[in-house]
Amino acid sequence: MLFFDKCVTFAKNCVMRKTRLLLSLLALLCLAPRVWGQGAAEEGFNLIVVGDPQPQTKAQLRSLEQEIIPQIGAIVEQYRAQSDLPTAILLTGDVVWDTTKFLPRVKSAFESLGVPVYAVIGNHDHARKRNRPEERAERPYVETFGERNQAFVMGKTIFLTFDNIIYNPDKTYYEGVDSRQLVWLSERMREVPEDMRVAVCMHAPATRLWRGEVRSYALPIVDIVGDRELHFITGHAHRHFTATLSPTLIEHSVAQVSGNLWFAPICSDGTPRGVFCIEERNGQWRWHHRMLGKGADERLVVWREGEAYGCEDFVVVKVVGWDDRWRVEWSENGVAMGAMEQVEMKDPDYMYYVDNEANYRKIFMDRLRRSASKRNHYYRLQRTSENSEITITATDRFGRTYTVQL
């Protein structure tokens, strides 16, 4: 699908983009190893992915500036203290909630952390007025963040920000990419080495996790990238998931940083407020969901007997940032008891908040309850003796272990 009204702008900037990308690649190839740890040389980066900031009101904007961004800043400072590897921030779209006048202020707030800030455009980042063509609807975003489709290199990965929201004059939208974007992607792929990892960053998901398939509009992207390792980084869904379709094709759906649309401090799938951290070390990726205000090693949330509705006789644990490569085991009084039982359930903390603490108009309360759904990143165990000592150990796909004791 061609949008001829944008072709002139696209062509004028093509040469500049290509030059910037080639300079970035040259810098990558010439980069001297950085010293890290006890004399060990490592190369890489830290990318803090922020899902759908989406402030709609001035109060939400202040909360983003005064509560959430300072906690992200603490993560930036921890990375700086660990090494001199570069750190950047990526916003997965819906930078605002139809309040495009907030865009410059949100960008400035994130830039105050002193690291590069990249973004993709979301459906709520358009100036939503009826009978407004897509180019005009995108103008506030483009004036703030630059072109919708950009490329930048970090470590041994090339990142491509893609606009996959096609906006209609009647204020509706659908998900897709146009043929010019695919041409642009093909040009980028001809310029980068075959062994360079590719990360395509878009707002709406590229896969259907429940079917284990790539959405039809994203299939040409997969074909163009070819045999390279490809990661999609997306938002929009307001929940966390990692879809591993093959060893070289993974999607990371990043949960909303503010919880459930600012109305709950937890996303409806049980993911606490937080960011998604991608760390590249010597060409290899590792990642985790980082809860705001918590340490990087805090990944387990535990409910004792009687605290989780529907599982009152069990100890229940939630794995934050779970995917299907996790292993969760337990021991009782020092005796290994094997794998914990995986269960699907609504998040106990989310439901407690909705039923006991949330106080909004009925329309919002109904939305909070309706959005809650059962997820499978929960595990449970039942003691064989009362007051026994329990140890829960969870191991992620990278071999990192996380332990809690009761």
Segments predicted by a language model, with ranges:
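Bacterial N-terminal signal peptides that target proteins for export
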Residues: 8-23
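Bacterial N-terminal signal peptides
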Residues: 24-30
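N-terminal active-site segment of His-dependent metallophosphoesterases
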Residues: 33-104, 386-391
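Active-site glycine-centered loops adjacent to acidic/histidine catalytic or metal-binding residues
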Residues: 52, 93-94, 122-123, 203, ...
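Short acidic, glycine-rich surface-loop motifs adjacent to enzyme active sites
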Residues: 92, 189-209
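Extended active-site neighborhood of metal-dependent phosphoesterases/phosphodiesterases
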Residues: 100-194, 213-233, 237-281, 285
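Binuclear metal-dependent phosphoesterase catalytic core
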Residues: 249-333, 371, 376-405
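Aromatic sugar-binding surface patches on proteins
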Residues: 348-381
